[in-house]
């Protein structure tokens, strides 16, 4: 996504999780619980990335412009925060993410894909959307392509989340996110 979150940018009421877990990471993958994705080579681990409604979140990012990043992350959506079904949870995540401080100057979005799918044989929901911004601090950034997968991990207390945000129109970074998505798997 984009700049660091600000407290006043959200127009959607999103939960703030109190669940605190931290899955051990490796040099080649990002893991949250049982959801795993390969890291994108050359993108740096981003220990500052967070989304208020997601626990156990781990991310790698690449600077596009000063103040504008592309990234991928895996995390956990918790039933105690209202995340119990993949479709509704994917939609809530998109609403919360698009209206968060990461998209300062949010000016709209266009949904491209909204469909049921599977990840490693597990039921999942996929959304791909273009999120548009008009941000005077980063005038060259038009927005991001956002890819969200919410995965039923077979646990009643949590769902797996993959989220990728890559600079609109940036074929190289979009391609790297697509390659990472193809490595998504459920472990254990």
Q: What annotation goes with each model-predicted range?
A:
Residues 42, 153-157:
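Short, solvent-exposed coil/turn segments at beta-strand boundaries
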Residues 88, 92, 176-179:
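Extracytoplasmic/secreted proteins, especially bacterial periplasmic and envelope-associated proteins
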Residues 157-166:
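Short, well-ordered beta-strand elements
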Residues 91-147:
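Signature of long, low-cysteine stretches enriched in small and polar/charged residues
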Residues 29-89:
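Secretory pathway targeting signatures of secreted, lumenal, and periplasmic proteins
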Residues 12-22, 70-73, 89-99, 103-108:
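Short N-terminal helix-initiation segments at or just after the protein's N-terminus
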Residues 1-53, 165-188:
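N-terminal targeting sequences that direct proteins away from the cytosol to non-cytosolic compartments
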